[in-house]
Amino acid sequence: MKKTDVKKLAAAAMLVAAAVVGSMFSIPVGASKCSPVQHLVNIIGGVYLGPWYSLGMAFSASLIRNLLGLGSPLAFPGSMCGAFLSGFMYHTVGKKLCSMSFARSRNLGSAVRLPLAYAGELFGTSVIGGMLSYPVAAFIMGKEAALFTYVFPFFVSSLGGTLAAVVIVTAMKRIKFFDTVLGSETVENK
């Protein structure tokens, strides 16, 4: 295992721990327990570690939260969809947009990519995760709900975490926090 892999795994583990501890501050909405800190961690992981690490972090945090009684099974579809889409939008879509001559000539970089990560988290968690929560609620939890029941509560929770991420990720980029912690091997610099 390479040294950078160990550093990335350690960073992911710290972010999972932050999500679990942060879930003690949750907003109960129906059968779900919305945790804005999870969405903040999803964006940080998606931006600095990539979509696959972020997806694994969201799964791990959701599993631990459920085992400790701090979350519900609805944590899985919401957090995992938002985490993956945040990283995917930042790294794949954002990189393609930044490689276009229009964006290159204006040196847009993070000005384009970060809003894509935020939008990915919001859309992935609220719309996709909210709709995927329907079968989880109906078949696993025994709660009858309409298909779009969880979209708005998930959006509100995700919006809180995303607004916090706007402030925190911008500050982390300014001081090059993860470049210092992980070295130059962050997904960002590849």
Segments from the language model and where they lie:
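Loop-helix junctions at membrane interfaces
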Residues: 1-190
